[in-house]
Amino acid sequence: MNIFTLSFAKAKSLDESRFCVVSIARFVPRGFKGVRCYSLAPSRELLHDYKSGLSESSYKVRYLKELGDSVHIHEVFESLVPFCKGRDLVLCCYESDGKFCHRHLLSDRVFQLFGYRINELSC
């Protein structure tokens, strides 16, 4: 099983027989049929503060603190495996490619802790 990231907008066109789409956002788009993983989403408070002017560097510090330690992150990913049923895992949120986004912070953290690179899915 491979793990990728992608925006919700691009995930709409994915083949569900090949990809297990998982929301790592606090809220999902209307009609979203994938798995919701609130454990990897930023808190409501963090989202509110960011929309109210919190800097990207402060957001990063707070989001990584919310994510927790390597044991917690590993347990969250392990809990997603049964939903995938052999398909590749795609972690989704709203931000488009190239924008500051928590899914990229998560990817960097996973690489830092486990040496596993999570890339943006090309589609």
For each feature predicted by the language model, list its residue ranges.
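Residues lining hydrophobic/aromatic ligand-binding pockets adjacent to catalytic sites
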Residues: M1-C123
